[in-house]
Amino acid sequence: MAYPFQLGLQDATSPIMEELLHFHDHALMIVFLISSLVLYIISLMLTTKLTHTSTMDAQEVETVWTILPAIILILIALPSLRILYMMDEINNPSLTVKTMGHQWYWSYEYTDYEDLNFDSYMIPTQELKPGELRLLEVDNRVVLPMEMTIRMLISSEDVLHSWAVPSLGLKTDAIPGRLNQTTLMAMRPGLYYGQCSEICGSNHSFMPIVLEMVPLSYFETWSALMV
């Protein structure tokens, strides 16, 4: 859950988001070391009186500043590729939910059930109850079972949208005429908020996403009532 004046990322709720946080720290540490080295060299150049105006060739230095950046890029690229392949893997999902973007709301269809579908609109500010979040609450939450692999099929009925839930490490484009897919798994119950992350018109800011992750028994009860 995000909070006011937050500087860092949201707490991870899924294995993918945990991996993304670790990769973020890994890349940030490399950037910090590079920046420190550059600042150190600049400070030496500004304070030393030694000059090398007559140097015409320095193959050793050129070799170092060619090989070292290549090694650094490999250290960043390999973990990144690993996470990308992990995000693309969808093995034996327990549930499939189809999400369609509209101007300016989301519709959901539980494809494993015969007649379980609904639209999800933002609740206007004047209709919010005490404790509810402005611009983030919806009239119909997406209820899903926790600790289970869920496949999300995402598309759009009109313009480009993007279905994003930061704490789960999810951000998938909703493209008209194209069906994208992603997978999610929440490790603990709760409400997880997201928003459309692709500018899609005048009410782009009013397309929130709310996932309600519950134990499997609660989900089965809810789905039976909805059907």
UniProtKB/Swiss-Prot annotation:
Record's subcellular location: Mitochondrion inner membrane
Topology of the protein relative to the lipid bilayer: Multi-pass membrane protein
Domain of life: Eukaryota
Stretches in topological domain Mitochondrial intermembrane: 1-14, 88-227
E.C. code: 7.1.1.9
Quaternary structure (record): Component of the cytochrome c oxidase (complex IV, CIV), a multisubunit enzyme composed of 14 subunits. The complex is composed of a catalytic core of 3 subunits MT-CO1, MT-CO2 and MT-CO3, encoded in the mitochondrial DNA, and 11 supernumerary subunits COX4I, COX5A, COX5B, COX6A, COX6B, COX6C, COX7A, COX7B, COX7C, COX8 and NDUFA4, which are encoded in the nuclear genome.
Primary role: Component of the cytochrome c oxidase, the last enzyme in the mitochondrial electron transport chain which drives oxidative phosphorylation. The respiratory chain contains 3 multisubunit complexes succinate dehydrogenase (complex II, CII), ubiquinol-cytochrome c oxidoreductase (cytochrome b-c1 complex, complex III, CIII) and cytochrome c oxidase (complex IV, CIV), that cooperate to transfer electrons derived from NADH and succinate to molecular oxygen, creating an electrochemical gradient over the inner membrane that drives transmembrane transport and the ATP synthase.
Family statement drawn from the similarity comment of this UniProt entry: Belongs to the cytochrome c oxidase subunit 2 family.
Name the UniProt record assigns to this protein: Cytochrome c oxidase subunit 2
Source organism per UniProt: Canis aureus
